[in-house]
Each structure stands twice: as structure tokens, then as C-alpha cells.
């Protein structure tokens, strides 16, 4: 194949769809790009290979792009995100034993995140009183949306995620096995691994993350700033190929074809039926077959999901500050926002953006607390009594 050769890493997750479809459907080739996709297992591998130049671009968890750019937790390598690969798509899954305990302790409908969170607080307190080990939850990386989503849900209901439970890092493909082996009591991960746990009869999906935050930037197409400066035309072509892929994925007429593509062993490696449920936002949430639907479960191209939103970057930085991963600084806040580049998206796709109807006014839509002001992180932090500042 002739074209600009690029090496791009990805994790087997549904929100890699735009990248995978861009290659497998030929949109990248039509843009003059010869992309080698490299399937990885952990976010640390992805980050390190992007940072040192082994990868030209990557399917990257959004907070990692920010942390790398700010030099948090690792070497400082400025990263740009000209395209958002997915908004939402995570879920919180728990073991049958923990699900039963939460249901028994709940004062109301556990589909309400506040009800389930307060029930979790009671279960955690009961375990502590009996001298038992704390509940353990898996998340994918310290600088991850999964970490922040678990913490936001728990802390809003007075569960201290550092004192009342344990949070441990696990690669996404290993979450299900860890739950089956009782190494964890629950986890937060992206699709399709929550559905895989339910289908195996070992997990209950407690919440879609879209029930906790109406709009949460999840993965981005990450490139090194230096690479973007050296390859502006290639970057534009790469974003255009992803834009075509996102539109193709969101067309219901293409769902069967897309599901089959993503199900391939060298892509995500699960059944096409599980992928189709994910794309449709129609998931079995219990081994017995109970189904929950949400049009917001995973947004790839709808509702301006692919356009990077600096407000989302500001919210992620605020979580880093809240949980002691970063100092509070106007310079760091500005640096975090600068990672998300809607100007590059617009330059590539030539679209004039306007607010989408039905989207949260603060661009976040959290289930608890005041609205988020991207220019006043101090007020956001002051609203919460649990944190590690």
C-alpha cells in the first residue's frame, strides 16, 4: 500500500471504533495513510510508546494525554488531542454478591447513583465493623476516567475511595478474569468488558457512567505536539479519516458491518452481538437478561462527541487536583485545556459548531453537586468534602 506510514496503538475497547473502522473500511487509505495498528493491553504501554515515538498516534485515555502534557506521574511529553474517539462508554459492574448486598442495603431504587452509593457506604461500614477486608474495585489507570468516575460516584455518597474501599489498577481485558477469580468486587471499565462479565454470569452492571456524568470525554486520538507541528498535513488527513469513520459508525444501517469488523480477533476479539449491543446502547445488565437502554451510553459521532471540548479537559484536571495528583494552578489548568484542540478538528473537517440540543449546560451534567465552571476550579473543589488536596 502506498501512503504516509503511521504506527498507531490501541486497546481492545469499543471506543477505538473510529480508529479501527478508519483503517479497516479504507477511509485512512483513501486519505493517503498507510496505518499499522498495534493492539496493546495496558495504558502504560500505550503512553510510553507514544511518548518515545514508537507510535505516531494512539487511542489514548483522555486524562493520560493531560497528565503527559503536564508532566504528572511520568516524563513530560506535550500531547495534542485533535479528535475525541468517544464520549461516555464506561460502566460500573459489581459481583453478584456485592450487588445483592447493595440491593439489600438500599433505601430506594439502586438505579439512582445516590441510592446505590449510600447503600455502598452502608455495606462498607458493615464490613469494617466485622473486621473484614475492604471492598476492592478495579480501574484501568491512576490517570483515568474510570478512576475519577468511581471516585466521583462514591464520594458524592460519602464513601471515601481511599479509606472505605480499595481501588486497584487492572488492564481493561483483565477486569473480567479478576472479577471471576474474586480478586475484585467490582470495576469500572469501558465496553465491551462489562457486557462480557454479565454474559458470563459473574457480574451485574450497576451504572452506566452516563448516569453519573451525562457527558464524559473518554478516549482521544493522541499525538505528540512535536509530531503534529512536523506533520500538519498528515494530521489533517488523519482527523478527516476518523471523521468519516465516526459518521459511518453512527449510521444504524452500518451497525452489523461495524460490529463484525470490531469483533475480529485482532481488533476487540469478542462476539459481534456484544459489540452491536454496545453501539445500540442496549445492554443486558444482569445475568438473567434484564436490559437497560441509553442513547447516551457511547457517543462516537453524535452530539458533537468527536469534537474535543476544553471544558472536559478542565473537569479532568479538577479531578487530578481533588485527588492529590496535581497542584492547583492557573497555568496547569490552561495547559490541560490546551491539550483538547477543537481548532484542529474544525480545520480538518470544516464544520461550524453550535451547541447541541439536550446537552448539559455545563458540558458535564453530573448527577450530584453544582454545575461545573471550567474557569472556577476552586469553586468545584470547595463543593466536595471528600478529597485529597
Language-model-detected regions and their locations in the chain:
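Short, glycine-/small- and polar/acidic-enriched structural segments
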Residues: 4-162, 185-197, 202-215, 377
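Extended ligand-binding regions for polar small-molecule ligands
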Residues: 27-29, 96-114, 218-272
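Active-site glycine-rich loop that binds ribose-phosphate moieties when present
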Residues: 121, 169-173, 229
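Internal, well-ordered alpha-helical segments in soluble enzyme and binding-protein domains
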Residues: 146-149, 171, 175, 189, ...
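Secondary-structure end/capping motifs
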Residues: 233-340
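Conserved C-terminal helix/tail region of periplasmic/extracytoplasmic solute-binding proteins
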Residues: 314-389
Amino acid at each position: 500500500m502506498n501512503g504516509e506510514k503511521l504506527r498507531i496503538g490501541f486497546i481492545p475497547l469499543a471506543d477505538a471504533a473510529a480508529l479501527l473502522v478508519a483503517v479497516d473500511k479504507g477511509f485512512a487509505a483513501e486519505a493517503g495513510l498507510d496505518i499499522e495498528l498495534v493492539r496493546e493491553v495496558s495504558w502504560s504501554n500505550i503512553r510510553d510508546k507514544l511518548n518515545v515515538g514508537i507510535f505516531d498516534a494512539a487511542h489514548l485515555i483522555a486524562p493520560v494525554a493531560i497528565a503527559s502534557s503536564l508532566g504528572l506521574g511520568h516524563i513530560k511529553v506535550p500531547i495534542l488531542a485533535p479528535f475525541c474517539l468517544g464520549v461516555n462508554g464506561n460502566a460500573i459492574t459489581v459481583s453478584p454478591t456485592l450487588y445483592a448486598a447493595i440491593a439489600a442495603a438500599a433505601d430506594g431504587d439502586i438505579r439512582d447513583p445516590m441510592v446505590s452509593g449510600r447503600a455502598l457506604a452502608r455495606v462498607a461500614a458493615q464490613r469494617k465493623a466485622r473486621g473484614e477486608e475492604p471492598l476492592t474495585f478495579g480501574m484501568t489507570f491512576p490517570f483515568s476516567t474510570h478512576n475519577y468516575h468511581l471516585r466521583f460516584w462514591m464520594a458524592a455518597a460519602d464513601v471515601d475511595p481511599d479509606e472505605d474501599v480499595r481501588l486497584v489498577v487492572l488492564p481493561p481485558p483483565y477486569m473480567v478474569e479478576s472479577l471471576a477469580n474474586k480478586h475484585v468486587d467490582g470495576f469500572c471499565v469501558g465496553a465491551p468488558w462489562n457486557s462480557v462479565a454479565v454474559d458470563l454470569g459473574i457480574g451485574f452492571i450497576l451504572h452506566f457512567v452516563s448516569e453519573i456524568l451525562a457527558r464524559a470525554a473518554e478516549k482521544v486520538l493522541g499525538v505528540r505536539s512535536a509530531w503534529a507541528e512536523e506533520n500538519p498535513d498528515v494530521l489533517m488527513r488523519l482527523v478527516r479519516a476518523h471523521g468519516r469513520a465516526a459518521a459511518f459508525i453512527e449510521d444504524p444501517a452500518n451497525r452489523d458491518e461495524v460490529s463484525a469488523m470490531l469483533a475480529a480477533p485482532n481488533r476487540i476479539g469478542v462476539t459481534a452481538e456484544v459489540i452491536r449491543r454496545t453501539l445500540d446502547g442496549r445492554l443486558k445488565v444482569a445475568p438473567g437478561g434484564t436490559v437497560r437502554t441509553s442513547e447516551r451510553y457511547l457517543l462516537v459521532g453524535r452530539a458533537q462527541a468527536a469534537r474535543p471540548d476544553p471544558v472536559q479537559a478542565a473537569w479532568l484536571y479538577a479531578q487530578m487536583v481533588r485527588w492529590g495528583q496535581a497542584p492547583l494552578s492557573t497555568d496547569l489548568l490552561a495547559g490541560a485545556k490546551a491539550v483538547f484542540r477543537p481548532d484542529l478538528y474544525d480545520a480538518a473537517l470544516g464544520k461550524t459548531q453550535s451547541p447541541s440540543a439536550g446537552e448539559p449546560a455545563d458540558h458535564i451534567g453530573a448527577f450530584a453537586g453544582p454545575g461545573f465552571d471550567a474557569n472556577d476550579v476552586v469553586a468545584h473543589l470547595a463543593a466536595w468534602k471528600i478529597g485529597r488536596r
